[in-house]
């Protein structure tokens, strides 16, 4: 079948819930809705986590893969059965959960919060290796007069690899000053960039 998958935030409930809707291109099929499990580390990420308050969601074959920027666990939902599973994916090097932000409205505090906590990025499937990868950055001290550009490039950066069943294989600390912190991540076919 052909369908579109999209993530939505349901604000009609408290705390807000996240869902994935599968919209079929065939007219006679109803929309399917899959409820994402809340973060096991913090069931309500809508309050106190600044810019880390929504899940990272990806799709692979018949699965929804997601995680939360504030914590290290991974989650998977089977699109055929609707059943979900959580996977422990702790870092060996960093804290596995972000602390709450001190302010709900002060953007300076939001920036500080973003630097002084780990941030877990989305889980990506690497088809040529039949495995998964997740990147995350560690917390770093944030001074009031710091150059944010330099500070963002000096954070410790980690790659965590998982087999095709989401079992952790290895975690590697990557060199600092070798990545752009202001972009989304993606995998490339053979591991080489074409310029």
State each model region's role.
Residues 10-15, 71-73, 139-143:
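Short glycine/acidic-enriched loop and turn motifs that connect beta-strands
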Residues 1-16, 39:
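Asp-box/WD-like beta-propeller blade repeats and closely related beta-sheet repeat scaffolds
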Residues 30-51, 85-115, 172-180:
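Surface-exposed loop and turn segments in beta-propeller and other repeat-based domains
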Residues 114-164, 168:
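Loop/turn-rich, solvent-exposed surfaces of beta-rich toroidal or solenoidal domains
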Residues 1, 48-60, 115-129, 184-192:
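Structural signature of eukaryotic scaffold interfaces centered on beta-propeller domains
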Residues 195:
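Conserved small/polar residues in nucleotide/adenosyl-binding loops
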Residues 15-29, 72-77, 148-167:
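Beta-propeller blade signature
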């Amino acid at each position: 079948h052909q369908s579109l998958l999209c993530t939505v935030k349901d604000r009609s409930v408290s705390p807000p819930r996240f869902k994935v809707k599968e919209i079929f291109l065939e007219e006679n099929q109803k929309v399917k809705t899959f409820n994402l499990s809340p973060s096991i580390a913090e069931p309500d990420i809508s309050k106190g986590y600044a810019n880390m308050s929504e899940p990272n969601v990806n799709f692979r074959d018949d699965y929804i893969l997601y995680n939360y920027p504030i914590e290290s666990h991974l989650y998977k939902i089977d699109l055929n059965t609707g059943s979900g599973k959580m996977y422990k994916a702790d870092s060996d090097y960093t804290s596995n959960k972000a602390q709450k932000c001190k302010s709900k409205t002060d953007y300076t505090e939001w920036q500080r919060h973003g630097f002084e906590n780990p941030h877990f990025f989305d889980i990506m499937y690497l088809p040529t290796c039949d495995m998964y990868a997740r990147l995350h950055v560690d917390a770093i001290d944030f001074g009031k007069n710091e150059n944010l550009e330099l500070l963002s490039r000096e954070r410790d950066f980690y790659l965590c690899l998982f087999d095709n069943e989401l079992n952790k294989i290895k975690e590697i600390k990557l060199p600092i000053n070798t990545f752009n912190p202001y972009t989304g991540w993606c995998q490339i076919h053979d591991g080489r960039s074409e310029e």
